[in-house]
Amino acid sequence: MQRLHLHLLSDSTGETLEMIAKAALAQFDGADVVRHFWPMVRSMQHLDRIMGEIAANPGLVLYTLVNAETRERLEQRCAALGLPSVAALDAVTDALQQQLGIQAKGRPGRQHMMDEAYFARVDAIQFTIAHDDGVGWENWEEADIVLAGVSRSSKTPTSIYLANRGYKVANIPIVVESPPPSMLFSLRRPLVVGLTTSPERLIAVRRNRLLSLNQAPETAYVDNEQVTREVQFARRMFADNGWPVIDVSRRSIEETAAAVINLYNERTAAGASGDGVKPI
């Protein structure tokens, strides 16, 4: 069966769009689909960057965009590439039938499926809360994703956001003086992703954190030399282990989570195609 790259574009969080795509794809047993998630598309410049990614992995484009100019630009660019673009609330199932080359089958029990999805999300949230900040490392193999990064690199909020999407996530702080559990380097099932940021951005975030706690704003925690050392140490660890890295310096939590989801989907697709699990 031919692989389909499915691009999901939204000018908001994209949660509704993702649910629509999941519901439609449930009609196609065994379909080889790689989902690419692009939320918060609110400028022409952002759209143009995404179109470069779409051109590299051509496929079906589903979108929920309110701005008429952005919609028109997307449709024009897709047409120029010879790619179908579909508003998500239109005939999603019909477009998937054409691209996948198989007939959608009527499937009863949709509400039951939604109930299962709801409980799976609750389970993911419970798992993620119980495995925050390096806690419960003995169970990391049960996770879908493990996020690693220095303190204040947005590991926890990104983990919670992903959990609300149904992913079981653990996260671990990378500390120079305290190496992480050895299990981190031998995980097979979870996707391990390194989160990094610039020392300048990290110092600003940490200083704000100290001020919010009414603590002295000038400590080793925000010392430029120390912070730079931490960031470099973490980056070397990521590189040595072949883990994909996301720079969160200029990303919102939603954008960081979307990047993680794309990495996860690509890794899952690589495994399903028989290529095995590879660093991304």
Swiss-Prot record:
Domain of life according to the entry: Bacteria
What does the record give as the reaction this protein catalyses? N(tele)-phospho-L-histidyl/L-threonyl-[pyruvate, phosphate dikinase] + ADP = N(tele)-phospho-L-histidyl/O-phospho-L-threonyl-[pyruvate, phosphate dikinase] + AMP + H(+); N(tele)-phospho-L-histidyl/O-phospho-L-threonyl-[pyruvate, phosphate dikinase] + phosphate + H(+) = N(tele)-phospho-L-histidyl/L-threonyl-[pyruvate, phosphate dikinase] + diphosphate
Q: Quote one Gene Ontology molecular function term.
A: phosphotransferase activity, phosphate group as acceptor
Q: Identify the keywords attached in UniProt to this record, alphabetized.
A: Kinase, Nucleotide-binding, Serine/threonine-protein kinase, Transferase
Pfam short name (any one): Kinase-PPPase
- The record's EC number reads 2.7.11.32, 2.7.4.27
The UniProt annotation places ADP binding at: 149-156
Give the family this protein belongs to, as stated in its UniProt record.
Belongs to the pyruvate, phosphate/water dikinase regulatory protein family. PDRP subfamily.
Q: What does this protein do?
A: Bifunctional serine/threonine kinase and phosphorylase involved in the regulation of the pyruvate, phosphate dikinase (PPDK) by catalyzing its phosphorylation/dephosphorylation.
Q: What is this protein called?
A: Putative pyruvate, phosphate dikinase regulatory protein
